[in-house]
Amino acid sequence: MYGCSLIYGFTGSTNFNVIANQLGSSEYAITFGIVFILVGLAFKISAVPFHMWAPDVYEGSPTSVTLFFTMVPKVAALTVFIRFLYVPFLNLIDQWQMILIFLSIASMLFGAIAAIGQTNLKRLVAYSSIGHVGYALAGVATGTNEGMQSSVIYIICLLYTSDAADDWS
């Protein structure tokens, strides 16, 4: 919310087109707003280093809720990531690209390594989900239409596999 407040405060609008047109006048201030919004979205999708809540929540939830948590909030937040970064802030790719590359690589590595030692299936699903977020963010981090499309296709494939896992359980 603070990031949205900063962007609105410096641009005077919530319209993405108006924000994109006003980037030159207060670019550094808007960058702070972007960083705060990215942190909030990274927490929502449980990307490393904002992932600490996911394994405990997944473990303590019923199986159907766990499978819901693995996809629905992540699909929504990744869609917001794409819409938020590609429409008004594609010109500021130098500011947000390195953040997403770090989140992506850290999530892929940590998700895979942490999943190896798990004996609880739900915690394994949580760490696997963290790794999958890293793969989806890798496409977004490219800043290209092809990268965005690959992330969308990856998310769609995850939806189908998550649905299959739900049917299996």
Residue map of PLM features:
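Alpha-helical transmembrane segments of multi-pass membrane proteins predominantly involved
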Residues: 1-162, 169
